[in-house]
């Protein structure tokens, strides 16, 4: 692979792919496959599915590169948009896709939550619980949290990936964050109940052993 391709812009790589240069696809894959995989993993929570989606995305890039319009959307947003559709198709195929109509857009009152719902948990525990909470969100809200908060895309790029207006991204993200915080509170409460039950069971076991001694 030439050094020129390694140093060229994403837009130029897409143009080279459209012109039938396979080495350009290899260069784009090396540069962007980790981003696509990470997005798919955040959305699905399944490494195998994320691997499949990543392969699907770059096959579609090879096919659809001539349709890419520089200036209308960034390559970052374009790839996320393709990945988003691939994730939905994979989840739907596995019968795990929530109905997009199940949770309508709602401008009503948002839940009130604690400022830090994860409290004194360790970093590893916090990350694990955050992942569970994100995966529990309805797809339309999970997407915007992943794109804007985890992937740190701009509102404009997120809107391009989601094929909606930037205002929709902002309002959906506002609600998604509130839903996420509420879910984190619920998960922490569940964990506290689990720990309490475990500790009580240990106390009973210790007491029984002492009585039998």
Predicted features, each with a name:
Residues 1-15, 19, 23, 27-31, ...:
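Intrinsic, short, N-terminal disordered tails of RNA polymerase sigma-factor systems
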Residues 2-4, 18-27, 37-56:
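Short, charged helix-capping/linker segments at alpha-helix termini
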Residues 18-19, 42-46, 56-73, 93-95:
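Sigma70-family region 2
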Residues 29-47, 64, 134, 186:
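Amphipathic, Lys/Arg- and hydrophobic-enriched alpha-helical face
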Residues 38, 52-59, 73-85:
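Structural recognition of an alpha-helix C-terminal capping motif at a helix-to-coil junction
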Residues 54, 173, 180, 184:
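DNA major-groove recognition helix of helix-turn-helix
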Residues 63-70, 80-102, 123, 175, ...:
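Arg/Lys-rich amphipathic alpha helix in sigma70-family domain 2
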